[in-house]
Amino acid sequence: MKFEAKLESGILIRRYKRFLTDIKLPDKSERTIHCANSGAMTGCAEPGNTVFFSTSSNLKRKYPNSWELSVTEHNHTICVNTIRANQLVVEAIINKEIDELVNYAELKTEVKYGSENSRIDIFLSAEMLPDCYIEVKSVTLLDESGQGYFPDSVTTRGQKHLRELTEIAQNGQKAVLFFAVLHSGIEKVSIAHHIDQQYYSLLLEAIESGVTVLCYQAEMSPTEMKIVRKLPFSI
């Protein structure tokens, strides 16, 4: 996935009100940019980090710049724009880069499904195969050992998605929880039961019901992002 134009850079001053971020530009001026991430962003938003941002062509936006990447003091690159996770996975599936999903012919996004009135991130179908429902989650929480975790805060929405995926699997269709790892320092992924015990319990039930967990990492730069490797996952 290539950005429309090469990202510009600045230095993070602060993130506040969840969706706003102040940065200092190379000319020492300051600018407020949009942060499309409502999560905790633990370790991703430290003052002094280098940030990269895109510029929207929509002239009606109050904040036309969007925070895309962050570079930590350990030189790890993180994508903080959660919208990119779905785009990356869709591109990888279309390009036949996800081995487990290469046999599907048709792809749709944001399809309504489930008893709790949800929308699935990605829906795949093909003749002679069960329909495939894919929920995408971005992983950016890292500890000092290279272990990545999801979620980074309690997620009632994520719990709902697990219940929906479990129901899909129990009905004989293919249900996939896809972790898109958007932190270059993460080497493996597990569930943060110390943060959200209910999510952990629901995922155990989901796996027992037949939900598949996939975990792939992206490489990121100011010009493009691309899913490149599969990472180990343990519950």
From Swiss-Prot:
What CDD domains does this protein map onto? SfsA-like_bacterial
Which GO molecular-function terms appear in the entry? DNA binding
Q: Where are the transmembrane segments?
A: none
Top-level division of the source organism's lineage = Bacteria
InterPro entries attached here?
Answer: SfsA (IPR005224), SfsA_C (IPR040452), SfsA_N (IPR041465)
Matches recorded under Pfam families: SfsA, SfsA_N
Q: Which PANTHER family match?
A: SUGAR FERMENTATION STIMULATION PROTEIN A
Q: Which HAMAP family match?
A: SfsA
Entry's family note: Belongs to the SfsA family.
Q: What is this protein called?
A: Sugar fermentation stimulation protein homolog
Q: Which organism is it from?
A: Aliivibrio salmonicida (strain LFI1238)
Instruction: State the taxonomy lineage.
Output: Bacteria, Pseudomonadati, Pseudomonadota, Gammaproteobacteria, Vibrionales
